[in-house]
């Protein structure tokens, strides 16, 4: 969040920064193999946080290290961030998914923000160009996937990749990146959302721009409200309003936030993996959805006059995530920070 030094450090309420640093630095060499182009197969007793550098989550660990370095100034964290960011360098040439947006923005985007270098900037611009190559002007969207039964699939997650285009538009003073991002957001706003402001996961388009189908790939069913999908939506439209000041995007962000806050079934506000999943002790929760939502709502709270309600809800989420129920102990949880996330339950 811009001017974040002015915000209360709610994440420190019940949150142990020393733990965060120790957990992130705990034997990170065991993550190295994850960031090879072709990692070795899983072995019992080893950990991998993604399947390869081309996995959609590959930029998250480097991004964690960059943020931890920003918060603490610990040089060891910076050195780790640089090393794990550099592993992703081949991704700048990859065009096979929309996820190159936050794969590279989480890693190289934070690298340029905190340790700028010409090679880092070049990698970001090249990645943004590759992401733009997936944009179809007739459809008005960036294609998400190159697999599956769909003609031109666009998933709500794609809203998270737009920040790379906004960032590179600022870096280059070239509006084409921003223009594509905003057109994608407009098309998604038109076709992804139901009357209650919940989102479909997948909308696929025909070549003429008409909708082929609306369905899910990771939610409970085609008409359900997948928790992380709603988090992607509120985060993405908050970013789009920040960059455009288009009030339609702001209203959408607020509407999704209201949906999330009113439909959550759990006392601690950490959502079940799908808002339409049965409310039972056996139903998995999704701490990752809560984390994305908290980040979005903190920023949203700074963009509106009535922002306290969003900040308070984000703080509630962060307090829950910082509790023993979700925050792992050092040396546990295979080195990961949070417990009880749900990746893709139907798959």
Where are each of the predicted segments found?
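Glycan-recognition and catalytic cores of secretory/periplasmic carbohydrate-active enzymes
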Residues: 1-347
């Amino acid at each position: 969040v811009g001017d974040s030094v002015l915000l209360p450090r709610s994440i420190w309420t019940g949150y142990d920064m020393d733990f965060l640093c120790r957990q992130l630095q705990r034997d990170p060499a065991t993550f190295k193999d994850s960031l090879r182009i072709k990692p070795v197969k899983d072995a019992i007793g080893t950990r991998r946080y993604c399947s390869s550098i081309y996995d959609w989550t590959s930029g998250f660990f480097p991004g964690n290290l960059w943020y931890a370095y920003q918060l603490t100034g610990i040089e060891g964290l910076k050195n780790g961030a640089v090393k794990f960011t550099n592993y992703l360098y081949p991704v700048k040439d990859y065009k096979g998914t929309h996820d190159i947006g936050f794969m590279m923005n989480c890693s190289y985007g934070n690298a340029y923000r905190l340790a700028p270098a010409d090679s880092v900037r070049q990698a970001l611009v090249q990645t943004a160009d590759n992401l733009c190559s997936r944009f179809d002007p007739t459809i008005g969207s960036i294609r998400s996937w190159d697999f599956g039964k769909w003609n031109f699939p666009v998933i709500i997650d794609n809203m998270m990749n737009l920040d790379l285009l906004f960032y590179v538009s600022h870096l280059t003073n070239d509006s084409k990146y921003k223009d594509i991002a905003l057109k994608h957001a407009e098309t998604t706003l038109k076709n992804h959302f139901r009357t209650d402001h919940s989102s479909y996961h997948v909308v696929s388009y025909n070549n003429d721009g008409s909708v082929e189908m609306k369905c899910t790939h990771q939610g409970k069913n085609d008409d359900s409200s997948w928790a992380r999908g709603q988090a992607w939506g509120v985060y993405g439209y908050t970013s789009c309003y920040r960059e455009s000041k288009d009030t339609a995007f702001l209203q959408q962000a607020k509407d999704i936030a209201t949906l999330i806050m009113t439909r959550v079934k759990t006392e601690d506000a950490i959502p079940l993996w799908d808002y339409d999943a049965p409310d039972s002790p056996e139903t998995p929760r999704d701490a990752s959805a809560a984390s994305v939502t908290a980040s979005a709502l903190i920023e949203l709270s700074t963009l509106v006059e009535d922002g306290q309600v969003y900040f308070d809800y984000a703080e509630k989420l962060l307090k829950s995530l910082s509790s023993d129920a979700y925050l792992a102990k050092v040396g546990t949880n295979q080195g990961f920070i949070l417990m009880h996330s749900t990746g893709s339950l139907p798959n």
